[in-house]
């Protein structure tokens, strides 16, 4: 199949006069001949493509001629192409920028762009400077700029290091201003023990202050170097004594912390078991109400049936079995699902002080046995009464 023919004679005849009438508008004459001679010899072959486009006979010829023209244009990369595509001057660039500033679309696209404060991107030397840096260096510079900017915005300033005296003063203020809620709940005897412990703490703080003063006065290498042997020995004894005192205090505080944690666990377990027993007692009460209601309905229906039926014999096997079953229910409970020890009442005597950890442990064991309906409930309850309520 032959390629379609192209008839361009009439169109180019119409274009020639328009190009001749307005010679100043040279870019509008796309297919006209070049009005001036090309200076570059490598582009001299383009002069042969002046009016030959009119003699094209098919699309294939048009494509081939276009390929040849491209090859001629891109043969020499160093050739000057200002005659073919003139570069815009500075005035035209400024006019385009002014028109872009009035465009709403351009403003919407460029509002989120924040240039770097340390670099002016309009500087022509900035491209050469950035070209010599690698991507990692550029990335590091950007991170440094971002960190500096965030620090300046947030106003973060490094606090100066505190001396030992300042730290001790802050600790004293914290201990004086922060009341301990546990000490308020303790009895008078424990308060006396707390006063003695606070006095011991104040003594330790005084020793720390005296020790730090000696350290601050003689901490430098030169100060220690000029001290005599007896002074160094005395200072060493002070340091070792302070270390022993602080170690003992640390051990006591850690032991106290362990005791408080254990007491907290015992209280939590007691509260948990108590809530579980109360929930089970509530379920059992609801179940008993339901059974009583069903029993009342069954008795009412049985009375109606007995009125319609003949009276049974006085001493029958059915009557004897019913009597035995009712006696067993009254002795051991109505059914095997009833909890025998769930509703056990635990005697408790309210005192001025809260129950101790040992008392809470005994109560927790009793409640756990009640929840499981264990046979150990009477034994545990007896031990609790003898040891807590009526100690010998």
Swiss-Prot record:
Q: Which organism is it from?
A: Homo sapiens
Q: What kind of modification does the protein receive after translation?
A: Phosphorylated by protein kinase C zeta; which enhances interaction with UBE4B and polyubiquitination.
Q: In which tissues is it expressed?
A: Mainly expressed in brain.
Matches recorded under InterPro entries: FEZ (IPR011680)
MF terms in GO: gamma-tubulin binding; protein kinase C binding
Coiled coil (UniProt feature): 230-298
Q: Segment Disordered: which positions?
A: 1-37, 175-198
Complex formation: Homodimer; disulfide-linked. May form heterodimers with FEZ2. Interacts with the NH2-terminal variable region (V1) of PKC zeta and weakly with that of PKC epsilon. Interacts with UBE4B. Interacts with SAP30L. Interacts with SCOC and ULK1; SCOC interferes with ULK1-binding to FEZ1. Directly interacts with SCOC and UVRAG. Stabilizes the interaction between SCOC and UVRAG during amino acid starvation.
Gene Ontology cellular component terms for the protein in this record: axon; centrosome; cytoplasm; dendrite; Golgi apparatus; growth cone; microtubule; neuronal cell body
Biased composition (Acidic residues) is annotated at 180-194
User: Keywords in UniProt for this one?
Assistant: Cell membrane, Coiled coil, Cytoplasm, Cytoskeleton, Disulfide bond, Membrane, Microtubule, Phosphoprotein, Transport, Ubl conjugation
Locations listed in the record: Cytoplasm, Cytoskeleton, Microtubule organizing center, Centrosome; Cell membrane
Q: Supply the source organism's classification.
A: Eukaryota, Metazoa, Chordata, Craniata, Vertebrata
Residues the record lists as Phosphoserine modifications: 58, 298, 316
Name of protein: Fasciculation and elongation protein zeta-1
